[in-house]
């Protein structure tokens, strides 16, 4: 017994030594950008919880996907559409022959080379999606493959992608109904109509995507990321009239309650849009109403992606609070305007108490809202112990990745290795993966009793194995801890000092 205790103690010490050695090396490369980038790229990153499929692809890849689609590029707006009279060089299949046009398209479809002038970063960003929408509608499977492979190559273990596979058929269904402020009655009408067939058709779409991705997971993905998990959030277009928004929300809640691949819902499109602002409280009431009927469906909401000047000051005072208290959001996306909320300190304390994680999108906030450095609330959330995780938002349009988000956190906010490790663990702990957590606390000090010895010895006991088999979340958390062990161990070697 004494031998076993000493053995376990020595292993735990070795883990601590490896973590300390890794932290020491990390501290030594703060002013060496290339080494820092290499370190962060190799570091396990857990999950990317805020990622839109519609913005995930690089423009170059979208042009490649659409090369056989017989689409035409508008010479001034660079939007694509079917046009039988299209002449070279504006056919998608031929744009690469014109160096200037090819690069103009990439700039128009992304934030590459963007300089504020005739349009703001906000306006340029939100204008990109309509330009390549026909490609998105037809090539979601290829975009999914791109997103998954990129995540795998960045040592990401889990991806929650926002997606609307039905091309807003749910919203079109809603447009056939007059608004009824009695949400119970409106829901009943929609359920008697075509909501469930739309839900079932979406699940069939996911079956198709899964088959497409299987070739990757059976091929390079088998070695690259054998433990990778992909789940979806059904996204709702908030810049639509109330009946359409409610029909989309109902579709999302029904879908997430039926298909385990869909773990929750989110609202997308510009939060400062005309209808988004006008109907914000109503939309939160809709989400809250459906939450009571579908309590197991998780909710992440874009809230507080606003700054003074973009909307009136009165519009900055309540969005995050309504998302938390009325819509019962489990997570908040962006949360940039938190300091302008009424009773902001009380709200921060409430979010900390309820453990409502904020998905922090540093590159996105800099490009769209011009908020970065000390103007960003990331340190404010940390000060009040509100959990946060780093995410990409629209990595293709923004020309970024998750590694870059970690680098920004280090360079701009001097986050330590242990802080980064906490954010990585947060991304799985606060994910919408089902099942109990491997950890009894959100500080990652106390694993569940059945896995405590396994974590300290590095060997999976039968009891822990059985527990992990009951929980997708705990299983991914275990895999993450193993990734950290493998990542940190080499830093004990002398050549890293």
Which residues does each predicted region cover?
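Metal-cofactor-binding active-site regions of metalloenzymes
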Residues: 15-497
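Sec/Tat signal peptide C-region and signal peptidase I cleavage site
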Residues: 10-14
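Bacterial N-terminal signal peptides
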Residues: 1-8
């Amino acid at each position: 017994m004494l031998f076993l205790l000493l053995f376990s103690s020595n292993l735990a010490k070795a883990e601590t030594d490896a973590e300390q050695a890794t932290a020491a090396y990390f501290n030594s490369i703060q002013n060496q950008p290339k080494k820092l980038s290499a370190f962060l790229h190799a570091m396990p990153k857990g999950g990317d919880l805020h990622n839109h499929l519609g913005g995930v692809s690089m423009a170059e890849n979208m042009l490649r996907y659409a090369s056989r689609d017989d689409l035409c590029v508008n010479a001034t707006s660079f939007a694509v559409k079917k046009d039988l009279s299209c002449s070279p060089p504006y056919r998608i299949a031929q744009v690469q022959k014109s160096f200037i046009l090819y690069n103009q398209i990439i700039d128009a479809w992304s934030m590459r080379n963007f300089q504020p002038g005739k349009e703001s970063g906000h306006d340029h960003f939100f204008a990109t999606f309509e330009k390549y929408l026909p490609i998105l509608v037809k090539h979601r499977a290829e975009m999914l493959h791109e997103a998954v492979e990129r995540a795998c190559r960045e040592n990401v273990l889990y991806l929650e992608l926002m997606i609307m596979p039905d091309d807003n058929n749910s919203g079109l269904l809603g447009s056939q109904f007059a608004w009824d402020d009695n949400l119970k009655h409106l829901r009943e009408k929609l359920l008697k109509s075509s909501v469930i067939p739309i839900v079932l058709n979406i699940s069939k779409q996911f079956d198709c995507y899964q088959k497409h991705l299987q070739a990757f997971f059976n091929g390079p993905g088998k070695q690259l990321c054998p433990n990778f998990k992909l789940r979806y959030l059904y996204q709702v277009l908030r810049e639509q009239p109330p009946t359409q928004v409610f029909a989309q929300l109902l579709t999302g809640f029904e879908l997430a309650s039926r298909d385990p691949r869909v773990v929750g819902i989110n609202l997308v499109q510009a939060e400062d849009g005309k209808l988004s602002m006008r109907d914000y409280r109503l939309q939160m009431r809709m989400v809250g109403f459906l939450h009571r009927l579908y309590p197991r469906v998780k909710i992440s909401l874009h809230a507080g992606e606003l700054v003074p000047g973009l909307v009136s000051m009165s519009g900055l005072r309540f969005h995050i609070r309504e998302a938390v208290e009325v819509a019962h959001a489990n997570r908040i996306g962006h949360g940039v305007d938190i300091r302008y909320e009424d009773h902001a300190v009380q709200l921060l304390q409430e979010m900390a108490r309820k453990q409502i994680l904020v998905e922090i999108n540093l590159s996105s906030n800099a490009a769209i809202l011009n908020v970065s450095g000390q103007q960003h609330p990331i340190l404010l959330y940390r000060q009040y112990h509100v959990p946060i995780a780093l995410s990409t938002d629209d990595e293709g349009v923004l020309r970024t990745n998750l590694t870059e988000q970690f680098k920004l956190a280090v360079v701009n906010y001097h986050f330590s290795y242990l802080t980064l490790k906490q954010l990585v663990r947060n991304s799985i702990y606060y994910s919408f993966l089902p099942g109990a957590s491997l950890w009894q606390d959100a500080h990652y000090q106390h694993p569940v009793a059945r896995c405590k010895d396994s974590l300290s010895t590095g060997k999976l006991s039968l009891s822990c194995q059985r527990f992990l088999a009951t929980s997708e979340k705990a299983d991914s958390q275990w895999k993450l801890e193993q990734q950290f062990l493998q990542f940190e161990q080499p830093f004990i070697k002398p050549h890293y000092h």
